[in-house]
Amino acid sequence: MGTKSGKKIIKQGLFKSKGYRQFNQYKEEYETKFPEFAKRFTNQLLEQIKADSSPNVTQQKFGEEVGSTDIILESSQIDPIKSKLENVDVLNDRVLRILNSNFVKMTFPVFNALFDASTEYFHDNKDPKLREDIVDGHIIAIDLSEPMDRIVDKDEDLDYLDDYKLMNPYILKLARDKIAKGGEEVLKQFENGFKDARVGQYLDTKLKQNSTAITEKELDESYKKYRSVMGTAGSNMALSRQPLGEVFRIGMGKASESVGCGNEIEDSIRDKAVKIPSWPLYYSLSTNDVRKGFELTMERSEMYLNDARKALERLPENFSHRAFLEFLFLTVEHYSEFWYKRLQKENIWSDLTSKLPK
């Protein structure tokens, strides 16, 4: 952990700080229970796929809702793919592929912690099934962005994109069914967040087509794909109740935008090309300097994280999981710092510059 934040994490680990202990507790729970979640996800998805007697209608409705026919199957493709995915082993493979995501790995322990903190603050009766449904539902909703991104980007899992197209409507329905267990307001907040995220996703796709004319405002709008989903999920871990709901919304939304910057740096290293669209691309083109572009991206990542940390100042006195959130934001800081440091070490500036869109 050769970053400033990494050294702070190590120090907290050595001294077993409260934040470290809480974070470790939820990380261990994630590692233990994740296989159960993946199995549950697969089986419930399988039930929906098998029970659907009108998969073509399901595809069309999903395409209308998300505003794109590019992410649904042609009617002639549906039956053979549906038949293939009705094999539990095949479906489980696809589920595990889309769950192999940094966002999922980072959010699972966080949502459980936020739900527990809310339960304690509001003196709710402990309800393990409600906790499972609310956390599962939002993880599944967030995970929907993985296959949708892969379908649009066509940069990984090329052999499975049609399978993902069939799965997407059922993933969304499963998420909705679980989130609805939290009540009308919780579902309403999710729907609003999902709608905003679709706006961000649409802009993301649009900006790919004219990448040299990206504006700061457009790129900020496209980041709704991060902040709307994560912010809404944060708020809903408190069942959309104040004051925690608003603090969780801002904190999780801004932290996810910070992670988004780190992810763009990571992807640029992997592809040896600046991600399109992204903050590194916007800044590289506007300054005519790729190094400066990534430097400014790090500054933006820090700005997002500072906003997330400011939200913690609004937490109630004696809030049980304050130290957890402070430690969490330290890990977010380390993520971006780690990939920025790796970028400097890789020294691929000439590749990045030569592949900039003209």
Residue ranges and their predicted role:
Residues 1-358:
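All-alpha prenyltransferase/terpene-synthase fold signal
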